[in-house]
């Protein structure tokens, strides 16, 4: 079984709530995880296959199955690495009302990972205020022009 075991995956330790591997400092761990997750779409698929195998043999605490018909939790590991936003379970809606899935790809994944609000359109309710016209200054009796400073000499030019 390549992939997971060959490039030394970390071991989940429940008491620290993290993935650790003896002899790894944090920099090498970051290098490993960056390599592991740099190719988003197809590597996650490969990780899912590995998870399916791991769910049958040894099951870490992160991968406790969420329900009997879903034997393993797909996003458990990337959630542990904080690479994917945790999806809130939404009430079942008809598929026609669901938004189309965005383009799969590195950019989309990185954007949604960094700032999850980028994809969501926020509509701010605008308060309609009836327009009140400013009172027009009446032309004064003394000067024929509508000059707000009637005492200053008229500008030439």
From Swiss-Prot:
Residues 135-148 have a biased composition (Low complexity). Residues 76-105, 132-157 are annotated as: Disordered. This is Uncharacterized protein MPN_463. It comes from the Bacteria. To M.pneumoniae MPN_091 and MPN_413.
